[in-house]
């Protein structure tokens, strides 16, 4: 399991390739990459600034990752999230789950993203054509996370 919160850019393809490197037991890798959009809620987005609570954010991500590992037979799990200034088209988040079989990898990847969106302390400020604004959480994110409650 690897949790990274960083201000530097990352290569999603390299992250996917690292998920199965030197582990021939991996039969499936499922990944999600989130990108900065150039448009949101009807406004043009020129950029975004992501803030986090150092220490608390990593702890929250680690707790989510541990829960995923307890639910599914994963061989590897990676969570990487950018902070700082980002421009449209840049990757913000990478979640990768590797398992012997595809369903565990699919489910774990979805679970981690759903919980990351609702439980990890990140704050997004968009620079839009109307000025800067904080991005609010969406009801659909909470509904997606609710499906994993046991």
PLM regions and their residue ranges:
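Short glycine-rich or small-residue beta-strand-to-loop segments that form or flank ligand, phosphate
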Residues: 92-99
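N-terminal, polar/charged subdomain of small-to-medium soluble alpha/beta proteins
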Residues: 1-92, 106-110, 114-150
């Amino acid at each position: 399991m690897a949790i990274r919160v960083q201000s530097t850019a990352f290569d999603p393809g390299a992250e996917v390739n690292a998920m199965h490197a030197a582990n021939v037991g991996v039969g499936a890798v499922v990944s999600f990459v989130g990108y900065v959009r150039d448009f949101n809620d009807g406004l043009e987005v020129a950029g975004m600034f992501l803030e986090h609570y150092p220490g608390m954010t990593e702890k929250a991500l680690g707790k989510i990752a541990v829960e995923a590992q307890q639910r599914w037979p994963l061989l590897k799990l990676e969570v990487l999230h950018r902070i700082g200034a980002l421009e449209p088209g840049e990757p913000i988040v990478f979640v990768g789950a590797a398992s012997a079989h595809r369903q565990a990898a699919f489910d774990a990847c979805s679970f981690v993203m759903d919980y990351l969106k609702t439980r990890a302390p990140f704050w997004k400020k968009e620079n839009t054509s109307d000025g800067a604004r904080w991005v609010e959480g969406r009801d659909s994110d909470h509904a997606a996370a609710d499906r994993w409650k046991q």
